[in-house]
A protein has these predicted regions:
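A charged, well-structured terminal subsegment
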Residues: 98-115
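Phosphate-binding/catalytic loops
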Residues: 88-101
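N-terminal beta-loop-helix "entrance" segment that forms/cooperates
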Residues: 20-37
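Short, acidic/small-residue loops that bind anionic groups at enzyme active sites
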Residues: 60-87
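Glycine-rich phosphate-binding loop
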Residues: 33-69
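Short, small-residue-biased leader/transition segments that mark boundaries at the very start
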Residues: 1-2
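Short beta-strand elements in bilobed, periplasmic/extracellular small-molecule ligand-binding domains
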Residues: 11-25, 83
Length: 115
């Protein structure tokens, strides 16, 4: 829903020297497996997406499993993965948080600059 704003806010906060490739996936649940396919190709990742709570527990399962999988990938690969996946209770929360991609970008830049 707010993919473009998330992506634009992330890109604006990355150094110009970074080579950026955007990879689209069907949904948030597919982000971790897609990152795992590209671990050898890239030094860092930014996961962007939005999950809005509905009337079933699906929101909880997707939010928790994708967050856990992304953290596991980052720890096991020792590569930073900025988590810019919005988990919102309603559309208004998503509107307010649509620039959170910037925080995910700043996080990976910070980790990459550590020695």
């Amino acid at each position: 829903m707010y993919k473009r704003q998330l992506l634009n806010s992330a890109k604006k906060n990355l150094p110009r020297s970074f080579e950026i490739e955007t990879i689209k996936v069907p949904g948030v649940f597919e982000i971790p497996i897609t990152i795992s396919k590209y671990l050898k190709k890239f030094d860092a990742f930014i996961a962007l997406g939005c999950v809005i709570k509905g009337k079933t527990p699906h929101f909880d399962f997707i939010s928790q499993s994708s967050t856990n999988a992304i953290m596991d990938l980052a720890i096991n690969s020792k590569k930073p993965i900025g988590n810019g996946i919005l988990t919102c209770l309603n559309i208004n929360q998503a509107k307010v948080r649509k620039k959170k991609g910037a925080e995910a970008a700043k996080a990976i830049v910070s980790v990459l600059s550590q020695k």
